Amino acid sequence: MEEAETNTQVDSVPSNSVRSGAELSSKSKLRDSCHACARSKVRCPKQKPSCSRCEARGTTCQYFFSRRPGRRRETSKSPNPEKQIAIGSSHANNRNSPSFSSTRSTLPSPIASDSNSNFTQPQNSSITTVHNGPENSIESPCWEDFSCEFSDTDFVMPTIDTPFDLSPAYSGSVVQEMNDTAPFPLSSSRISMGTTPSGKSSISSYSQILPSITPTTTPVAHISSCRCLATALDLLKTLSLAGLADADSLVSAPIILAENKQSIESVNNLMACPLCSGDSFPLTIFSMIALKILERYAVAARTQHQGTRPQEAEGTVEIKLADIVISNNEDQTRLPSHSNIVCCDDKTQARAAAQLVLGELHHMQRLVNQLSSMIKRSAERDGRKLEILNGYNDSIDSGNSMLASFSASTLELVESDVRKSLRSLSTDIIKELRQH
């Protein structure tokens, strides 16, 4: 029985092939020209079964079937029509679903498999609903038409050059900030840097898709790392507030002199710093502090010229009452004038205050001399820089001048003003002492 069945199957094969050849020959059409005329590229008389031209030459006249362009219908048929019907029905069901219609515009192309990248699912609520369903998963037949196998060269991303460290200890806020800069949205469920042991691999994969981050900071001129400038500004603020307090109330000269001496020592300590010695900003602030100290010296020198307090005047009058001069006439008693007593006492105190201030001005003189030498060294240094840059040092305003700094001429003018103020104060005090 088995041999008979095999024989019948073998016999049926050529019958089918003969039938298909007959059908093909019936559907095909003979050429208009014979093969000999077509090869010679001449016009054929189109006589059948043999044309007159072939008979005259004695060649064999053959008419072949014409070959039409295009594919044949028999070869285009699917070998498995049932599978094609199943795939078509699944496509139709997915297109009719509301989730598919809502995500057609936002659905990106497949990125990569899990073996190549950790970011296969985009961060989108509508897309997430499609992937969660068993019918709409990536493994469903509706994704068979898409090729999900990509090589590493399909998505070439620039390397990351970021100044911060992407360590697994960062919180989710950093991940959200990274999602904003990524070329496509990322899923937080796929990036578990802080809770999963594969955080480092996630970071390395994420670094491959981040765009290149280059610092855009502009070069800045040299800034000293010390806090001398900030300390000098605080001292200048303190002296300014103290000057306002001196103008509102009567402060004794010894207190002002002690505060000025302490301020001078602070400035000397700041000027001894090697980091800010060549910077023009601290030198300018030091000059302003020196002017404020001279202003307080002037206030201390003329403090007693404003008159004494009422209780001090009464005490002075009581002491001077012992010097009452009584004339020989009992009816006439001459008492010293109250204004003359106060004036004499004020002059004595003013002279003492002026002498104290004049004795303390040598500290200020030493400070001004040190400031002047620093300004001169700074001017020489700036001159050498300009000579190197511009080829000459006679002009600061032309060419490539120094960025964010005072010129040497400005510092020299400030130093000259400080020295003139010191000279004027000492001259006024000496003149006042000579007059009294």
Curated annotation (Swiss-Prot):
Residues 1-27, 90-136 have a biased composition (Polar residues). SMART domains: GAL4. GO terms for cellular component: nucleus. The gene is dmxR14. It is found in: Nucleus. SUPFAM superfamilies: Zn2/Cys6 DNA-binding domain. Residues 1-32, 67-136 are annotated as: Disordered. PROSITE patterns: ZN2_CY6_FUNGAL_1, ZN2_CY6_FUNGAL_2. Keywords: DNA-binding, Metal-binding, Nucleus, Transcription, Transcription regulation, Zinc. One of its GO terms (molecular function) is DNA-binding transcription factor activity, RNA polymerase II-specific. Residues 34-61 bind DNA. It comes from the Eukaryota. Transcriptional regulator; part of the gene cluster that mediates the biosynthesis of the dimeric xanthones cryptosporioptides. GO terms for biological process: aflatoxin biosynthetic process. Pfam families: AflR (PF08493), Zn_clus (PF00172). InterPro entries: AflR, OAF3, Zn2-C6_fun-type_DNA-bd_sf, Zn2Cys6_DnaBD. It comes from Cryptosporiopsis sp. (strain 8999). This is Transcriptional regulator dmxR14.
